[in-house]
């Protein structure tokens, strides 16, 4: 689709100042698995970094070390994470991708996130 067409263009045009961020929460993989996502981006000519998308220190390290040399490859950050992490009723449950909490659920969410 359009993502892979864009990935191809980014590498072919040598857009070294381009950085894509993939919210890799595995929700789409349940419907259409992608084998070796890192290898797929590499095959398009991108520099790939994989981090724990829940780790503030890994995110800060990635962005502070990011080099936007226009003569280098474009970069992609695969941020592995779990949808709804940190809340018992939402963590890993795909329905929360589009669901609105009712009042009771909202109170549970606020309590578990210390809000």
Where do the PLM segments sit?
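Glycine-rich ThDP/TPP pyrophosphate-binding loop and its adjacent helix/strand module
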Residues: 1-115
């Amino acid at each position: 689709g359009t993502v892979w067409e864009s990935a191809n263009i980014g590498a072919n045009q040598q857009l070294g100042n381009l950085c894509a961020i993939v919210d890799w929460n595995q929700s789409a993989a349940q419907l259409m698995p992608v084998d070796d996502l890192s290898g797929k981006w590499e095959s398009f000519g991108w520099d790939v970094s994989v981090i724990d998308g829940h780790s503030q220190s890994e995110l800060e390290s990635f962005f502070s070390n990011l080099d936007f040399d226009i003569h280098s490859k474009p970069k992609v950050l695969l941020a592995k994470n779990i949808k709804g992490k940190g809340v018992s009723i939402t963590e890993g449950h795909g329905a929360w991708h589009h669901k609105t909490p009712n009042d009771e659920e909202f109170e549970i969410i606020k309590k578990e996130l210390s809000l």
